[in-house]
Structure formats: C-alpha cells, structure tokens
Amino acid sequence: MGKIFDYDGVPVLHTTSGDLKGYFYDGVYIYKGIPYAYADRFQMPVPSKWNGVKDATNYGFVCPLQNQDTPNGELMVPHRYWPQDEHCQSLNIWTNKLDPEAKKPVLVWFHGGGYAAGSSIEQVAYDGVSIAKKGDSSLVSVNHRLNILGYLDLSPFGEKYKNSANAGHADMVAALQWVHDNIALFGGDPENVTIFGQSGGGMKVIDLMQIPSADGLFQKGLVMSGVMEGDPLGAGEKDGTEIVTAMMKELGFDDVAQLETVPYPQLAAAYAKVSPAIAQNGGYIGGGPKKGDYFCGNPFDAGFREHAHQIPMMIGTVYGEFATFAPAAYDKNKLTAEEILEILKKVYGDNAEKVLDAFKEAYPEKNGVDVLAIDRAMREPTVKLAKLFAKGGGKAYLYNFALEFPFQNGKPAWHCSDIPYFFGNSDLVEICGIPDVSDKLESEIFGALLSFAKNGTPDHEGLPHWPETEAEDADTMVFDKKTEVKHNYDDKVFAEINKVLKPWSFMDMMTDNIQH
C-alpha cells in the first residue's frame, strides 16, 4: 500500500496556547506554523494565545530579509523560499506518535544564515520526516526574528528597548519554553531536548548555553560549522546610539518610536545606507546578540558559564566550508605532482613542500592541491573551543565532514553539505547521490546524532569509538568514504599554513556563491 494521508482522524491537541490540529502522512504527524510567541517590534516576546482550533497545516511567515532572495548554488544547497513578515515567531513539529507517555528524544533545529537571514524551512534538507520516522524522535524547527528586527540595540533610547539587541535570542528561548511546556503532547520528552544548528544556527546553540533564562530548557547541544573567533558579524562592544541616530536622520525622524511603525523595507533601506560607514570606522551596527545581563557573551571572551559545562556538546565543521563554493581553476585529477607543487608555491612560497607534506600526513587519500580548499575559518577555532569546554569539565565530541563530491572534478565538502546526512535526508539532495558512499555515511552520521540525542554520546555500533575532547588533546571523528578517528591530525597543516598566510578574515572568503 502507498503512503497514507489523514487529516480528519488526527486528534485536536490542547496546548498551553490553544487547540491545535495538524495532519498525518506516511507514518508521521506534522504540525506547521505553530505560533509560540508574539512581539511588537524591538520588544520581548510574550507567549502566544489563540481561540478556537488553530490549523497547523501551513508553514508560518519567515523573518523579512535585508536583501532580496537570490537563487544560486541550488545544486549544492537546494533552497525553499517563503512569504515574509516580521511576526514570524512560529515552529514546526514532526513526530511519529501522539502519546504523552512516549518520552521520545526531542531535537530542536535552529537554522543558519548568521543572525541576519535564513528560516526554519530554507533548505530542502531541513525536512523532519526522517528524524521522526527513522529516528523515532520528535523534531522541532524554529523561526525567529533576525537582522535589525532581532539584533538592533535601542537601549540608549529608553528602558522599553532594554533587550532589543537580543530580541531574536529571546524568541528562541520563548520557543524552547513552548516546547518544554507542550512537547509531551507530541510524544516528546521535555527533559531530553537536544538543540542543534548549523552555521548561524550553530552559533545560536553556543549562545543559548550562555543565556541563563534558557537553563533547563535543553540538555544537549550540537554545533555544526558555528564557531568563529573575533566579531565577524559586527555586533561590537559599543551601544546603538550612533547607528540608530543615523537611521533616524536618514528617515527624517525625530522620535525613536517612529522606528517601531515605519514599514520594514524603509527601515532596512535606511540601515543599509548608513551602516557601512559606521562599520568601517569600527562602530556598532548590530548583527548579533549583545553581551549584558541577558546574554553572558562569547565564551572565547567571557568563558563558558558553569551551567554550560553540564551540557554535552557535539561540535564540528566540514572540510572546506566557505573556501569551496567557487569552482576550482583547474582539473586536479589531471595535475602531475610537479604541477601541484608549483601551484602550491604560488600561495605558500618556500613553505609549500612542508605544507604539502603535513597535508598528505593528515589526508593521505586526498589530492595534494586540495590543501588550498582546507577550511581556515572554523576548524581551528572549533578545536580551540572544544578544548576550552573540556578544560572546564564539559564533554565535547569533535567531528569533521571531509567527503569529496562527484562535482566539478571532485569538490571537497562545502558549508552546508553535511546537513542532508545529519537529517537523514541525503535522498532529497541530488548531489548526495553517491553510490556505495552516501547510504553508509548517512547511517554513520544520522546514527551519531540519534545516539547523542538519546544518550548524550554519539557512539553507536556503526562507528569506531568516539573519544571525548581533552583540554590539551583532540580526537576528531572524520566522516568520509572511510570514517575514522584521527588524533590531533591536522595541527601540523595549519601550523605550516599559518607561517605564511595572514589570519583568516570572514570577508576574504565571501563569494557570490556562498550559502547558509
């Protein structure tokens, strides 16, 4: 028999916000666009309430973007685009059982896009059916306020704006509170919640570990490609006086309250006009959460909170991240050893041979020219953060997704290319169609996620033993055609590269093909 659909037979659920009705398809109960909170612009969210039965068969609005959606790179990272509105606080749930006693592991997904873009349904691979059906878990994905709606500091202009710079994060905490209060209705265990996210979503996972009001709302965290040192997104340490004053001047306003009601496109246009000059002069332009009473700050600067060390963490990167979006300038499979060395000398000069030797020691199966695509954005900071976490007593499990794809003469893994495997959705992404590789790799990665969500450790029968990171020592599970644990394996590569190249800059690797 084919896939079964049911709507009329699906019971109405009585949540803390109101009555809710979803639908059933192919073994999974699906609820879309559940309003978990409401907020006026720049204000803290309040719990949602509605009368009657809320139809949960349509995704909710996604947060407005500052720039127009531009389809590109769809083969590498297939996207979905959706109507936008700033009242975007909604979540989606996939589960295979509506039994309050089922106590299934709960996974809550925070999307990528930095703090400025993205949505809970942005990527095709975000679909939650596999986690619910094959993974026997409940999957929740969350929309929240972004960019200037979620992260613009107006606190110098009045007490009512006290936490406007963290409004987007406050939305996420409100979503977690809604999940805690209601997920048992969907078969989930409110005391076994794993939050996970990629890119900006990974950053959000770390941030939530640094927010006291989120304590107790999740028990584990998975950080995917979400660690960078410094201030790459421009949050800054100063307050919003300069940027907000400049926006008001651009709009011809004399009262900050006018920013609360001006149409979003005009607000975004004013920000886009005045922010570059302020950023160039080192001023605050928003862009991320702001350290203070609500958010305790980046752990590189502020250290991890004591409570954070109680939360086991999976944390990792992909081989190339941003460096591999643009096509290579050559067919590496046709290069001789001499040609490879000459190419590397153009980048690493007299240190090229040492770089190549260290790289071949770390990745003996890869083409030597692939060292040019190695991730210098996130891998080193990720290892550093995992060690910092371990030093404080936390349990961290490092990974690196190093698969080469059959595209453009063998493209190393790029930012987002691991997502289909974590969601058990490699069959939804065409470029993952790699015979004898993708099924095995998905089993390894998907199995690690599910084991971590259930037990707090990613170990499972399909993998070699996965050791915890230590304060001065790092074992990494390298997911590839042959998955294996490697010990401090790429330290020498980066040491040799860093003798020649300046520290990585976020803007150095930005291309028109970057996805999130």
Segments from the language model and where they lie:
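Non-catalytic accessory segments of hydrolases
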Residues: M1-N166, P190, C432-I445, N455-L463, ...
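Mobile gating loops/cap/lid regions near enzyme active sites that modulate substrate access
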Residues: I34, R379-H516
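Active-site loop->helix "elbow" adjoining a glycine-rich segment at hydrolase catalytic centers
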Residues: G112-G113, A167-D171, S199-G202
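Alpha/beta-hydrolase active-site loop
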Residues: K162-A184, D239-E242
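Substrate-access "cap/lid" subdomains that shape
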Residues: D181, D215, M224-E339, G368-K391
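Alpha/beta-hydrolase fold nucleophile elbow
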Residues: F186-Q198
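Catalytic nucleophile serine of serine hydrolases
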Residues: G197-G200, P212, S225
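Short glycine-enriched nucleophile-adjacent loop
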Residues: G202-A214
